[in-house]
Amino acid sequence: CWLRDAFFVVRALNSLSEVGTMEEYLRWLHDVVRDADGGHIQPLYGIGLEKALPERELAHLRGYRGMGPVRFGNQAHEHLQHDVYGHVVLGAAQSFHDRRLFRRADADDYARLEAVGERAW
């Protein structure tokens, strides 16, 4: 999952009133921030929060209209991309004010996001 899309995913799910799915995504985003090493956030993670995503070709899959190759992973997980911090903060902002959520963000969540912001600074 590319974190550069975090804000847009939250916005789209909110616009569709997909509150349950949005809350699950916000929980995933929360877990990314919680597990951030010293505030460092990768540009992308696996859906199960996997950090190492080496690119490899899946030869047994033909690809779209047989036009393969199909690849899994991306070496970008090794990169430092500063824009990702803003996308995470903007995406997570919904969890602080949306009263429809079962679990809204709290002071501990704010402190974790603050560390993310400091890392970007």
Label the model's feature ranges:
Residues 1-121:
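Acidic, mature catalytic/reactive cores of soluble proteins
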